Amino acid sequence: MGPLINRCKKILLPTTVPPATMRIWLLGGLLPFLLLLSGLQRPTEGSEVAIKIDFDFAPGSFDDQYQGCSKQVMEKLTQGDYFTKDIEAQKNYFRMWQKAHLAWLNQGKVLPQNMTTTHAVAILFYTLNSNVHSDFTRAMASVARTPQQYERSFHFKYLHYYLTSAIQLLRKDSIMENGTLCYEVHYRTKDVHFNAYTGATIRFGQFLSTSLLKEEAQEFGNQTLFTIFTCLGAPVQYFSLKKEVLIPPYELFKVINMSYHPRGDWLQLRSTGNLSTYNCQLLKASSKKCIPDPIAIASLSFLTSVIIFSKSRV
């Protein structure tokens, strides 16, 4: 399947995909939990759903995989001093980055192949700070939709690149060492309920920190539990000291099982490919050249956009 969007020619592909999109906001939520769903049934007039639906806006989740431009982006991040620009734009981030850096140095470990200290610190910076997680996810959902907006308003260029690169490098390292391609992990969200159906395709449009521990998915109580079979996520316990797998925002999943209960729901998801809207956005922001968008590996009936604000935890 070719790219869903060819920005150079401004043509939508394929033409059989209906332009239906919607944004859903859970009432009373605080922390953004971005999901992109395809195949989700639209609510009917009689359905009782505690959400607000807006059919006017696309989500714009920033999901760059840096396909074919990883080295160039790394060089530009350094040359443009984007680390300083990003850190100075966020309150207390420099202190938190220093703390994450010190935590890595104190572990005294050897870096995995092809990884740098910055990769390790980026993982700790993200996984150890809930404020960073919240701010980062919110920014990915709203302020990187065009190259110009990305350059001007997205102050997580450095973190996004190094988290994405770290996941990709760790996957290669894991495959070379033990041949492990996929992981069964668990994730739960508090005070959130989802309505999907078996066979629907779902995408978490954010970096999702999940647990390898099965007991994490056994505590019911007004929450949604996910059992996820990820094939693009990477284990980060070597850095965070927790049995975690970090799932990238561009991985697609199919809902293969589910159950609903008054005090807790459960969904079982299986990896089914990847989907990115953006590619090499940093280079596009500083160049007039047309850089190809990424190829989407997926079969979608239509793409429905959903943004959910909630409290979530592993």
UniProtKB/Swiss-Prot annotation:
It is a lipid-anchor; GPI-anchor. InterPro entries: ADP-ribosyltransferase_ARG, ART. Glycans are attached at N114, N178, N222, N257, N274. A lipid is attached at A285 (GPI-anchor amidated alanine). One of its GO terms (cellular component) is plasma membrane. Expressed in spleen and T-cells. It catalyses: L-arginyl-[protein] + NAD(+) = N(omega)-(ADP-D-ribosyl)-L-arginyl-[protein] + nicotinamide + H(+). It is found in: Cell membrane. GO terms for biological process: arginine metabolic process. Disulfide bonds join C69-C280, C182-C231. Its main location: membrane. Belongs to the Arg-specific ADP-ribosyltransferase family. This is Ecto-ADP-ribosyltransferase 4. It comes from Homo sapiens.
